[in-house]
Amino acid sequence: MNSEYNAQKIEAQAQKYWQENKSFEVSEDTSKEKYYCLSMFPYPSGSLHMGHVRNYSIGDVISRYQKMQGKNVMQPIGWDGFGLPAENAALENKVSPAKWTYENIDYMRDQLSKLGFGYDWSREIATCHQKYYRWEQWLFIKLFEKDLVYKKNAIVNWDPVDQTVLANEQVIDGRGWRSNALIEKKKISQWFMRITNYADELIYGLDKLDGWPDAVKTMQKNWIGKSVGLEVDFPRHNADSIKVYTTRPDTLMGVTYLVISSEHPIALEAGKNNPQVQAFIDECKTIQITKETMKTIDKKGIDLGVKCIHPITSDDVPIWIANFVLIGYGTGAVMSVPAHDKRDYEFAKKYGIAIKKVINENISIDKNAMTDKGVLFNSGEFNGLNFDQAFNEIAKTLTDKNLGRKKTNYRLQDWGISRQRYWGCPIPIINCQNCGIVVVPEADLPVVLPEVMSFDSVGSLIKKMPEFYQTTCPKCGKMAQQETDTLDTFFESSWYFARYTCKDNNDKMLDKRANYWLANGGVDQYIGGIEHAILHLLYARFFNKLLRDEGFIKNDEPFKNLLTQGMVLKDGAKMSKSKGNTVDPAQMIEKYGADTVRLFILFAAPPTQNLEWSDSGLEGVHRFINKVYRLIMDFIQDHKSHAIGTLNNFDKAQKDIRLKTHQTLSKITDNMSRRYLFNTVIAALMKLCNTLSKFNDTSKTSMAIRQESIHILLKTLSPIAPHLCHYLWKKLGNIKAIINEPWPNVDKSALVQDKMQIIVQVNGKLRTKLMFSTDVDNAQIEAQTLANENITKFTKGKIIVKVIIVPNKLVNIVVK
């Protein structure tokens, strides 16, 4: 008997079989229900980390399970190839970003293969390949022609380390999301996408995403930030009025000052003639203010010395510059109501500005602002109105005076998509002095990113390459310049899920195959980290709608179901090289095998929770794999000298084994199909393996039961530990590979029990558990329960009020 489990040998055999038989290559098949499972594709950083292993193990189990359900399953993989890290690594190693990226792809592809993931490698894409990005250049032109892409001078987030512009979503607490550098504000010409045109649909579409975590939907809803309020004009003497936006027009009568951004045109004009104002403006430039940091910074301001006019009372209202007002949000001006806003209250107290209370007369504001809604007073004609009444009446008054209007605002702003770096998709635009902005003709696509042999400076190399940017205008034929900005890498990752469906089409961005795979809500299961909630996931939803409106796809949303997996921790912290707490998957695979690594990563915690790495835990699941191996090998040895009979005429021990087997199958089928609780699936299979290891009877019926049980064990374990199960299934003499086997069915007759366990409570507290025959009636259950010595000690000397029996489950004795 061969009892030695050789992971490397077994896994190599299985992987060779899958590759030679193209086990995971799929095409469209209308006779089957499709299932599209996708994990967020990796950035080719050099090697896989345990977070990758967890993400892709989850996706692979789901894919293999759905394949066993008879569905036409597609699970593709690719590479998010462009981006700053490649430039930084190339700079450090004095190589080209292309060389660094493609070498990493080769290495990581080998790592993924060794983990046994069931990918359709024929669909592999790399976003840095011109065959991929030519189509986003084509889409860019189509969107430009629809005015959904435009260029304007704008104040942007400038990362001084990475030397590029960042989108608002890429600034975290005032710092660059990759470099962690303090972000500066610059005014430069940039390309934008009108994501705000889709703001309402992006919000309302969230209500239809029943398969998404509520946390992600809430984050997106808050980021889009829809609000309904009033835009109010505060006139100025002999000058343009100042527009402010407010969601609390009920407080308008309590305005005692206005604050404007240090970048507001009024502030900049005042600074020309007032050195103190200019000094304050200069000070504001040194402070990194974001929507997130405004809550914590020291609030500072300066009185401009000029006033505006209250639109209803006509009173003079002083104008201040404050360091907490952002020019990029709203109008860059805010009406201040210190009696009813915490920040305004603190600012007014600090600078001795008047405070006028206009809501809830009986509540004191001596120590704090009163921010709740209530009944107006001290508000002239609006006295006695509640919030809704005041909103409508004040809106009507302002509209009649042409000094205000109802308005819907969004926190979401148009997406700045141009980057001042080399390693990205070139923007297909030509700048001509005569013709202005001209699109690159479709026949000239793709605009290919020129290769460089080495990389030795921060910034965009193509700005220094006249052979790239010097061109002729396709309209007038005169000298012109190719755009040297490249696209934000989120542009590439926003539509890759659709390109997988027809990667081999060189004539169209997408074809009819996209509608086959994206039918019924899009990708059936998407897997990735929650950190992508308001970046990639929002942009992908936006792009899906763009592709729909171009007529490529019919679905409104890209991802029907979303699973956000937890992080992999070690010593209580997220694994990172800087902390020195990383675990190399390659070393673990070499030592224990891929199945052991997969098993542990799925067993240690439910998919959505954080997972603590444990060497002892890894050893434990490795022992389990060895136990499964020995179990099947022992059966094979017994089968050499003992025949297998039929499944009938069972004794008690045989019934118990079948009961345990089919109870386990029922439980894990539920956990695999509905809840993805792979940790409980594995725990149940471990218990089943232990049970089967103790059942060694070799009678014909017992051999049939053992065969049935180990078939169920291997089939249900195969999505999780596919190499081992492939090998053992073949060893058992099965002709068809286990990857092509269906998921087993529960034999309900095996679940019929002669006895049942009943929980017994006294006044709702658990006191014992009793076994009864399944044919016993309630009267017998009550009599036997009341006579049980574990119960009589709780009922002795007391009056039994009633006995409640829940059939097959529980008895509750109520006493007093």
UniProtKB/Swiss-Prot annotation:
Please name the GO terms of the biological process aspect recorded for this protein, alphabetically: leucyl-tRNA aminoacylation
Q: Which EC number(s) does the record attach to this protein?
A: 6.1.1.4
Kindly indicate whether the keyword Transferase belongs to this entry.
no
GO CC terms of this entry: cytosol
As for subcellular location, the record says:
Cytoplasm
> Sorted alphabetically, which PROSITE patterns does this protein's record hold?
AA_TRNA_LIGASE_I (PS00178)
Family matches, as CDD domains: Anticodon_Ia_Leu_BEm (cd07958), LeuRS_core (cd00812)
InterPro entries, per the entry = aa-tRNA-synth_I_CS (IPR001412), aa-tRNA-synth_Ia (IPR002300), Leu-tRNA-ligase (IPR002302), Leu_tRNA-synth_edit (IPR025709), M/V/L/I-tRNA-synth_anticd-bd (IPR013155), Methionyl/Leucyl_tRNA_Synth (IPR015413), Rossmann-like_a/b/a_fold (IPR014729), tRNAsynth_Ia_anticodon-bd (IPR009080)
Which GO-annotated molecular functions does the record name? aminoacyl-tRNA deacylase activity; ATP binding; leucine-tRNA ligase activity
Binding residue positions for ATP? 577
Q: Where the protein is mainly located, per its record?
A: cytoplasm
According to the UniProt entry, where does the motif 'KMSKS' region sit in this chain?
574-578
- Kindly state which keywords UniProt assigns to this record, in alphabetical order: Aminoacyl-tRNA synthetase, ATP-binding, Cytoplasm, Ligase, Nucleotide-binding, Protein biosynthesis
Q: What HAMAP family does UniProt report for this protein, alphabetically? A: Leu_tRNA_synth_B
Q: Which family does it belong to?
A: Belongs to the class-I aminoacyl-tRNA synthetase family.
Identify this protein by name. Answer: Leucine--tRNA ligase
The species this protein was found in = Ruthia magnifica subsp. Calyptogena magnifica
